[in-house]
Amino acid sequence: MTQVIIDGDACPVTNSIIELTKGTGIFVTVVRSFSHFSTVIQPEHVNIIYVDDGPDAVDYRIVKLVHSDDLVVTQDYGLASLLLNKAKIVMHHKGFIYNQENINTLLEQRHASAQFRKSGGRTKGPAAFTEEDVSKFESIFSNLIHKYFLETED
């Protein structure tokens, strides 16, 4: 069973993913901490899993859930690195695909920024997520699910 697993605590494209997978046979699993609890009723193809509010509780649950034919959306580079050999595709909500070539650079940049902040330096946060970013993600995501999950062999 193909599913899209979303690291859902801070994912700005959750609604886009749910909308783009409607009627495709692809299931969506959103993993969130209880601090992000919602009573919004979701479509039948969507499953919301709530976990404790611990620092990596969502990540641990995602690692347990993922299968080799899944697509995972996360902005967490550490989680992405753990999933590269488990999931079919691991992508960021900005639309880029994590792979063995870029993950080490991303982790090194994250570490260098953390060290700089620890020594008293200040770093800029991420740029605001725009409608253009949403459109870019939707285009890339749609192409991926059609290429890897919806095309059938004749």
From Swiss-Prot:
Family membership: Belongs to the UPF0178 family.
Protein name: UPF0178 protein SSP2038
Entry superkingdom: Bacteria
PANTHER family assigned to the protein according to its UniProt record, in alphabetical order: UPF0178 PROTEIN YAII (PTHR35146:SF1)
Pfam families: DUF188 (PF02639)
InterPro entries associated with the record: UPF0178 (IPR003791)
Organism: Staphylococcus saprophyticus subsp. saprophyticus (strain ATCC 15305 / DSM 20229 / NCIMB 8711 / NCTC 7292 / S-41)
Disulfide links within the chain: none
Signal peptide residues on this chain, from the entry's feature table: none
